[in-house]
Amino acid sequence: MPTHAPVRAIRRWQAAIIIALFFVAVAGSAAVGWWYARESPAHQGPILLISIGGLPAAELASYGAERTDTPAIDALATESIVFDRAYTHSPQTLPSHASMLTGQLPPEHGVRDEAGFALPASTRTLAELLRSRGFTTGAAVSSFLLRPQSGLSQGFSFFDAEIPAPSGDEAPALEREGALTIDAAERWIQMRSGQRFFLFVQIDGRDADAAVGRLSAALKQHRLYDEATIVVVGDHGEAGSGMSLDDTALRVPLIVKQPNGEGAGRRVMSPVQHIDLVPTILDLVRAPEPGGLRGRSLRRVLDDKEAVLAESPIYAESYAAYFRFGGTPMFALTGEHYRYVRGVNEELVALTPPIDEAAGGESTEAGRLRSALDRMLASSTVAAPAPILSADEERYALLGYLSAFPHAVSVETNLDATAQKSTVDAHRAAAILIGQKKYSAGIRALQAIVRAHAPLAAVHYQLGAQLLRMGRIDEAIEAFDMVRDLRPDAAAGALALADALMHAGRTMMAREQADVAIALAEHEDMRVLAAAHEMAARVALSEKDPESATRHAEAAHTADAALPVPQFVRGRLLYDEGKYEDAAAQFKEAEATLREHGGSMADLHLYFGESLSRLDRYPDAEAQFREELHAYPRNVQAYTSLAMLYRASNRDADVEDVLNELVAATPTPEGYAVAAKLWTILGERSRAEALRSDARARFRGDPSLAQREQDGRR
């Protein structure tokens, strides 16, 4: 037994060492944790991210402006850290906010323009990441572009984007009054029972100072201001065409107020960017950072006035010309001293006093930034934008957008830089005229563009759509023929031509073009193939060919299961047979499919309403006609059906209202002619003649006016 004593002694010694090391480790960890927590505690108070639309940094006193009308922002800046060189990744509202709220560049999140793009549901937003850490999340936004359909509402438990509907002949609002947005944000703050919340507010530059002042006051009222982290940032610089990538467009204010004004009065001179916001805010609350973020946390420079950031070139892009008419996209990389810009030409812009050539100079910087941009773009792909919904066309036109040529986009022109800039401006002006319902003037503006630059297939396509709207069908067919000549590989051109031929009653030729579109669409997006088969099904219905209509309807559904063309076609066939109950059942099924997938289909609610009307279910029929007009505000037949329903129900005041709505929504020769014809049918010949007189004055010289008047008297 004595021989075991040394072993027991050794084991006791080892155990003592292990226990001692354990306590040393625990104590060390506690000490490190205490030191780290003391030096850099997690922000426990509320977080406010206030985005200001179109406010250049140079207009604020904290950025050197001598005269300002932003006292609240100026006061906040004195309690904050100011970033002197903060940059956006896009001179456009939606792409810049997508980067701001995801920490991803436009090529990564996929939102490349303001029209036809939305943030994918698979993308994780800052709101989602904070909500998973126990934050209550809310948002109030002013811009139409940031409504929930943009995808930016992901992760927000509360997202207020309600824009009041226009009244009478008013144009639809592109944003709501800033006071309404601030009201919504204040109400949300008042309802919070704790301080761990994240609030995002987007406001136009005109309302920015009021927003900062009122929200700061609301936090103070609830004793949350001192502990709050407030980030004020611009979405982009000066508003314009979305083309410029210079400092006036890309440089934005960035002001960060930390709890208890930590670091107040300091300035950070290193270049920073929108995609730094997500990792910074996550770091401030000690939340884990997800993989795939290209930005970096700015906490080091927030905590330490001596800290500096390593240079990291900042990416920006503009696809304004590319998506609007096939022009050349623009890209930029901003470094410490230079910005490299690539568009029609390439340019190196000095941002600071030039570097001595012995230290590298312009040629070295240009080569470095050019190579870095090449690497970034090498793996970047660009999807074509989705079509603008009919209900949104007027708003987007007022923002300078017409429906994009729905084809895999490619640069279609060799315009030089001056010509491209002038074309962007001319195209934007044409779109705004159309948004103002000055259709004839808008058509003339588009015609001037294609006279100057004939190869622009996208503009011919947009011109054809506007001519068709005005009832100038033969001219529309010519425009779409030109699209087919310029882009014979594009299914969209054949589809548009088929539609115009249908309007002209030339169904045989329409069927031929629909078949061409189907053949071309086999090599494109499945949505295009579905649209081609849907067009073929509609042509077959007009030709009373139920077999072909059914076959194409099934093919459309195979290409896109969210498109209930089979139910629509079955409903149409049953309706034509007078089986209104069965037809209504098919239309109801189609309606449910669209509701599930969030789509729309022209004439679905119209025929659903017609079926219900013939079953004497007038209130339900009225609701369907209104649904049609909500999705397709210029559907003349829906106005006609609604007016006749009101007449049958002895609702004469409603008849007058709906005919006034018709003329307001479709101020075209067709709209006036249909309204005049309906007044004639209703025995109001004087009112009909008054409308015709107004039309002659408004559309004097319009080629379609005489034909419309002749049709209206039949």
Regions found by a protein language model. Give the residues of each.
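TPR/TPR-like alpha-solenoid helical repeat scaffolds
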Residues: 527-535, 600-607, 611, 643-648, ...
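Structural marker of alpha-solenoid helical repeat scaffolds
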Residues: 452, 486, 520-524, 559, ...
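Catalytic domains that recognize anionic headgroups
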Residues: 2-499, 503-508, 512, 523, ...
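Terminal, low-structured helical/coil segments at or just beyond the last alpha-helical repeat
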Residues: 657, 669, 674-714
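Canonical positions in the second alpha-helix
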Residues: 448-449, 482-483, 516-517, 555-556, ...
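Start-of-helix register in tetratricopeptide repeats
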Residues: 424, 458, 492, 527, ...
